[in-house]
Swiss-Prot record:
Protein location: Cell membrane
HAMAP family: UPF0316 (MF_01515)
Topological relation to the membrane, as annotated: Multi-pass membrane protein
Protein name per Swiss-Prot or TrEMBL: UPF0316 protein BCG9842_B1857
Superkingdom of the source species: Bacteria
A Pfam family reported for this protein in Swiss-Prot or TrEMBL: DUF5698
Lineage: Bacteria, Bacillati, Bacillota, Bacilli, Bacillales
Similarity comment: family membership: Belongs to the UPF0316 family.
CDD domains referenced in this protein's UniProt entry, alphabetically: YitT_C_like_1 (cd16381)
GO cellular component, as recorded: plasma membrane
Residue ranges of the TM segments: 6-26, 32-52, 58-78
Keyword terms, alphabetized: Cell membrane, Membrane, Transmembrane, Transmembrane helix
Amino acid sequence: MLQALLIFVLQIIYVPILTIRTILLVKNQTRSAAGVGLLEGAIYIVSLGIVFQDLSNWMNIVAYVIGFSTGLLLGGYIENKLAIGYITYQVSLLDRCNELVDELRHSGFGVTVFEGEGINSIRYRLDIVAKRSREKELLEIINKIAPKAFMSSYEIRSFKGGYLTKAMKKRALMKKKDEHAS
């Protein structure tokens, strides 16, 4: 029984680490992923080793499977809380909606406005890049000002230049100034 509990606990530690490592690889953060992979591998070997010692012990196998499933739930929760990376939203509007553009820019979001031809009229598309950690804030602003907007989103693997890069550099400089002032 104690072995089954140990296997379960190891799995709910191992699987979230596996999730984080996978995300780091997808985000092209290979060095961080390799570091996390060391811990992941060690836990995996210990847990699986206990299970393979006695394959007739069904409690250990069940603990492994339930721990894996629970670890997936926990890993998904942790990934959402960490919100690593950036996201782009494309927002389609019937009118230019300067109020929305101004509010997004005032809130620190980079916004590019495009005019295009829809089936019945001119349409406007906003391209908005944001940190994933600010996605909820972004959606609240859009839904408050343009609740009928059509939106689609996708995650960004990498980017270069633009407003967001300038804003990040500016924040880094401000942080250094604050550290030197203290």
